[in-house]
Amino acid sequence: MPEQFLHGVEVVEIDSGPRPIRTVRSSVIGLIGTAPDADEDLFPYHSPILIAGKRSEAAGLGRDGTLPAAIDDIFDQTGAMIVLIRVPDWFGEEEWPSFEEEFEGPWLPNVGQIIGGIDDETGQYLGIQAFLAAENEVHVTPRILIAPEFSHHPAVANELLSVAERLRAVVIAD
């Protein structure tokens, strides 16, 4: 049993690029948000994408939405490993709310997409739940979860905390 316990810091190494990237496993950031101008092939909706320490890997996101600004802010501090999840700008591509629905209650675009869940037809994780698939898809687990400009909503913060508990991660909320 003692040989299974890790005494110290665990390091993850990604060697898919021209040179290996090493980072502490507990410093992988999970970032969820919007990027309406992103390249659909490089950044599909609700899929974990690994950005391994270079701004150039995020070039296909465009300039609009919450993800490009958040990635710029992160890389202004350090070259971090980021597991990125892109969600649609609205409830769905063709599911724009009517004028009456928009003004009946609080105007919260994207909150439902950010919170996510599980697709009934495909079984795919959606929104924040997609962080649970990161280990299988990109071979790293995010340990710091952030949802810039959305985590101040109680429902989003609660979902982040729920997923963080399952991943043994921490949440940084607005």
Can you describe what each PLM-predicted range is?
Residues 1-174:
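Surface-exposed assembly/interface segments
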